[in-house]
Amino acid sequence: MPIVKVRENEPFDVALRRFKRSCEKAGVLSEVRRREFFEKPTWERKRKKAAAKKRLLKKLSRENARRIRLY
């Protein structure tokens, strides 16, 4: 859990912004959304496999775009 210590004479808004940023970096909100409902192991594997496929296609399309720009 991210911890933010409020500095002396620091406005609440600034401290809240720092806390939100640290929560985002730690992935707290995405973890809560992921754990909101039970996910069967088969669904989890399917989701991870789809994410890996998406990453691979994205990487390949970026490499292909670079090749096209070189010519």
UniProtKB/Swiss-Prot annotation:
Gene3D superfamilies: Ribosomal protein S8. GO terms for cellular component: ribonucleoprotein complex; ribosome. Signal peptide: none annotated. One of its GO terms (molecular function) is structural constituent of ribosome. Keywords: Ribonucleoprotein, Ribosomal protein. It comes from the Bacteria. One of its GO terms (biological process) is translation. Belongs to the bacterial ribosomal protein bS21 family. This is Small ribosomal subunit protein bS21.
